[in-house]
């Protein structure tokens, strides 16, 4: 009746067809037409185009809902499917017409809201039998909170403890209420205040929260938002006496609620908002909308989203989550609900709904439609070596962004009040104390004021200098009129025999004194607005490292990552040290990377993990190692000589022959003379500032970042005082501060026009280029020793990250065709970002340069890379070291070529002097595009800047365009003007992308270009010295794609001209004057150097063995015992077998699901077959049922990541490394508990399918890996589960692999029993699994502890015992969650790899439990990685 009779061009305008009785409504909204206007249009076109079948999608809801903005936006997009026609039933029709008169439709989207006749909708669905998006009968249940809670409970979904009070005369036994002063007893269940009282009707939003008298009593009354209020406080403390209610525990959520919106079981969007219970004030933005911000769901929460969607049979469903005490609880299910104001969500939702409808209904109409198989579904990309590989892991270590100058003051304090403060905050436990919180700084300020008051009364000559410092301490702490822990920090270090010679002017050693404290005050160093822009833009550029973004979503840079991320196939963790500038840099980067909006604070809270309590990214620069003291003394001695540098000095100061160092020394010539010049220039500068302050016109002058001339003068005056000591000698340690300050003023305060700053910058930079890198060691050996002292924990964590990726995903995978078709969530990318300070970046680079990664005499590529690094004079803000791990599934699983590692580097922000960095090696695909590259696949171009452009037969030297890569997102006209459902779009965009960033030479056939370049282009992130970007980081730059498409291969010359930009601007993050730049307001923000490839032909084995060797070599005798656990594990990992996937378990061929009678919520495939709708979890096709279960390691990986990444990282604090003082540290070295011993005892009991394992440690991984094979069969979809296993796996290499075999023996039986019990329908398969995976593998599975409480907890605790840095709490939470997961063991049944039936109903169980498995892993990952529960003493 309502079908289209012509094939209209619907790509530009969405068509809405309105049912009778709503003509007046048909004219509103973009693209909406009345029935009459459409009829005329159809008549006009009827003769031109033969009729095509149409699927009619009916919208049956109240007008307020069907015409809402979200619905309109989604329906507009839905109409872009060629064969879908939308019909909106008018409210008059719904309310007044009998259902027989309602328009017929093939698919019905109908949902209840106030006043909606649900009965009529149910009758209509029975009459017409349309395909229902949201089940109608279940909507009756959603209106009753009692039924909602009952269903949630049946599904095993966590919800707060509750009791129902039914005031029903027919059921007096359910109406027992005893109210006390601070508690209420409902039907025998006692609820102490605070508790929540909810009406049983879901339509009644008058929810009350009752507070205990100790907190003041009263209640908070929540209601539907009225204006700017959502609740009000009432002094009434008595519960309501009429009506039926649900009483439940109040969950402490830290003031935020999470609202989750599902679109099918495999997609969920989550937003956090201020809890209405907090103060009742609705936070609104400038447009009057409630402030919400997107959040990441944990794996367990993703599982909950799926289960809610399936249990209530609502494809589109919203529900509320409470995050409390490390758990997530569902407290409300709202039914049909859309996200407001999220274009991304509208795109995704329409695509998922459209694909769901097409999948179910298209076959009936013989409509040609198939599941789009896009390259984005698997992160396969061309690497820089030209081969097609799957991106598995990205590890980046990034320095913070542009900051204000750091300032520091040291003073010795001996007053008892300081000692009392030191003791109060636990300083004696570690000998050090950091005070950052406002209340702590207030205590310091109070003591300072008190001492100054005493000094005024009793001045003593001998402490005059201290008086000045106390005054400065007071003035700094009083700055801004309030405390912000990010801006200032006080450190106290205990010296039992008095502080040694101070760095602030005293050259002679003092005699040993009574105990004293060294107080170090640090201020400044805040991230500037420019620093935020740099970080956010770099985050945007980093998106382009990730694959995908084809088809309808190729409209803006980096959307492949966003799709990967929103569909839960991106395992992202961001770590930052505890410095405010570092944390804010990480938050700004995350904002750009994930296209988040709003302020940085909520992003920081939600996304950035603080790694400060374990030394992972922090370093105590005030406690130098003996090696650093020696180096510093030697450096100061050489630079105090008033004579030109001679050959001896060059030998002493630059034994490594660093090009940049030699250049700087040639500029300096005589260090003392240069210091004299620098001092004179500083004096001149302070004189100019004082003069400027006398100028009346400069009284209210505001400098950059709200600095005043007075503060600027203080900054320079302090440097002037400190640089030249009383003895006339210069304090070389102040040179970096001088360079820091002058660089800041030249860049940000250039408008002042101060004289001499350019010369001061030139000279101080030359000095700093000697002092800064040489403070980290002069000889190669010193550099490595100091470097490992700084970043040993980080090295261990990087090693862990690489091996975890390798271990949990290295088994044989599904054929890419199947995986693409089902959007396998196992195809995920693991990203670990570490934001830190200059010391860690210098140190890590030193390890790679001087640690012996490769022999430069044997490797020409590495030799040129070292030459490039040698020419780098400064590791500026936003310096990046990036490690990318690829897997080549075409290689033999045991081959070393299976895993491919690339090492990239960028020196960060460009200096004030353009071109101050050398021409890099380029982000080079050493692909086989010509014979020369074939013969030397590992080579890189010379450092000669002109070489690339002189070789036209190589990939073109194209430079990124700022507008598309790092500017604001733009949609591609090619894509957006076509229908989203059109397969032609997919093929066209695929073939039109000539290799993305790789603009190939004309000799390359277009077909080959298509195969090699799965991504499109992004600007700036990758060096164009050799070619215009990374093919291992396909980007999404429309410019290259759309223009490139129009140019035939023969016109590459013109394309080269079209895309070429001068090299100096190739990462134009903020060249505001560039006409194409998207960031117009940041003209002062320097651009960032692109990534250069240091090496693109490393194997995982090489890198892992190198990192292991470095960590072992620098482990001192004291830490040897505890390090044995870690190191032995890595020795195992370095053996032949572990670095390639082990023996594989063959899984039956997968079958794509045929159209089924099942509703969409039972769909085993993903809701959307396009990247945007990728599964949130392991829900692939029914083929999932072929997956076998994994060994315990899969569960424990995440534990281990933390334990090793955080706990064991601290094991070896020798040779300058920082020792983490944690209680129970001794337990680390107790040999009795070391899993190292376990392999010998337990290996013989390895699982079936694994070759009999000998007692050699090397065999252990073989157990793991077959387990992984089994695991991966289910574990692939559970990409997160492997994380957990590796986490514990890394800690106790054998604990997971063998400990489980041993310790979990008693659990094995239970595994089988509960599996069988909980999976009655799959009883046979459950037993089959237990037999097949073997009891022993089942025991390894005990990482999903079957006993929810004690057993699981005990087992996990046993495993966790050797690394106590992480306290028990996370384990307990983990064990409960994992236990819950294990109870849902249908996963295990379905995961049995021998189950051939792919379409059985048990399929759903499989998917859910795979998800559960995944959930646990990520849950653990997140909980344990945060490590916030570390004991306070560990935090110092």
UniProtKB/Swiss-Prot annotation:
Entries under InterPro entries matching the protein: Acid_Pase_AS, His_Pase_clade-2, His_Pase_VIP1, His_PPase_superfam, VIP1_N
Reactions the enzyme catalyzes: 1D-myo-inositol hexakisphosphate + ATP = 1-diphospho-1D-myo-inositol 2,3,4,5,6-pentakisphosphate + ADP; 5-diphospho-1D-myo-inositol 1,2,3,4,6-pentakisphosphate + ATP + H(+) = 1,5-bis(diphospho)-1D-myo-inositol 2,3,4,6-tetrakisphosphate + ADP
One annotated GO molecular function: inositol hexakisphosphate kinase activity
E.C. code: 2.7.4.24
Biased segments, Low complexity type: 1163-1181
Residue stretches of biased makeup (Acidic residues): 1405-1436
Keyword line: ATP-binding, Cell membrane, Cytoplasm, Kinase, Membrane, Nucleotide-binding, Phosphoprotein, Transferase
Residues covered by region (Polyphosphoinositide-binding domain): 382-453
Any one cellular-component term (Gene Ontology): cytosol
Coiled coil: none
Modified residues (Phosphoserine): 939, 982, 1032, 1068, 1140, 1147
Residue numbers binding substrate: 64-65, 224-225, 259, 273, 337-340
Broadest EC class assigned to this enzyme: transferase
UniProt binding sites for ATP: 145, 198, 205, 224, 248-251, 257-259, 275, 320, 332-334
Annotated spans, Disordered: 915-998, 1131-1191, 1389-1436
GO biological process: inositol metabolic process
Location of the protein in the cell: Cytoplasm, Cytosol; Cell membrane
General function of this protein: Bifunctional inositol kinase that acts in concert with the IP6K kinases IP6K1, IP6K2 and IP6K3 to synthesize the diphosphate group-containing inositol pyrophosphates diphosphoinositol pentakisphosphate, PP-InsP5, and bis-diphosphoinositol tetrakisphosphate, (PP)2-InsP4. PP-InsP5 and (PP)2-InsP4, also respectively called InsP7 and InsP8, regulate a variety of cellular processes, including apoptosis, vesicle trafficking, cytoskeletal dynamics, exocytosis, insulin signaling and neutrophil activation.
Comment block on domains: The C-terminal acid phosphatase-like domain binds PtdIns(3,4,5)P3 and InsP6. Despite its similarity with the phosphatase domain of histidine acid phosphatases, it has no phosphatase activity.
PANTHER family to which the protein is assigned, alphabetical: DIPHOSPHOINOSITOL PENTAKISPHOSPHATE KINASE, INOSITOL HEXAKISPHOSPHATE AND DIPHOSPHOINOSITOL-PENTAKISPHOSPHATE KINASE 1
Family: Belongs to the histidine acid phosphatase family. VIP1 subfamily.
Protein's recorded name: Inositol hexakisphosphate and diphosphoinositol-pentakisphosphate kinase 1
Source taxonomy: Eukaryota, Metazoa, Chordata, Craniata, Vertebrata
Gene: Ppip5k1
